[in-house]
From Swiss-Prot:
SUPFAM superfamilies: Histone-fold (SSF47113). Belongs to the histone H2A family. In contrast to vertebrates and insects, its C-terminus is not monoubiquitinated. This is Histone H2A.1. The gene is HTA1. The modification N6-acetyllysine is found at K5, K7. PROSITE patterns: HISTONE_H2A. The [ST]-Q motif constitutes a recognition sequence for kinases from the PI3/PI4-kinase family. GO terms for biological process: DNA repair.
Amino acid sequence: MSGGKGKAGSSEKASTSRSAKAGLTFPVGRVHRLLRKGNYAQRIGSGAPVYLTSVLEYLAAEILELAGNAARDNKKSRIIPRHLQLAIRNDEELNKLLGHVTIAQGGVLPNIHQSLLPAKKAKTGASQEL
């Protein structure tokens, strides 16, 4: 007689998360729970949270890569809101997607109107007519 509550030959394999099955880092289970609690629809399919999670992970990776490049260009090792702002506003598609989003402490893009710049002087040289 075995004297424990567990099974004698525990051949159960460890459970694999849906995130691991899909090869994702973001939590599929949490997104599924939020979709159910959010009353977006009466029923949520099993593939919907996986797809949404993969889209969110891709967008986050894209923004963080561009922000990391902006931080490196400014010789910084830490991404700050300014770097996020520069990354989003300099990318045409991300700027369109997040056009009406305000990033706190993001600042503005450096831009000087063309009419405010000093006029370019014509070169004096051999090419001028006499």
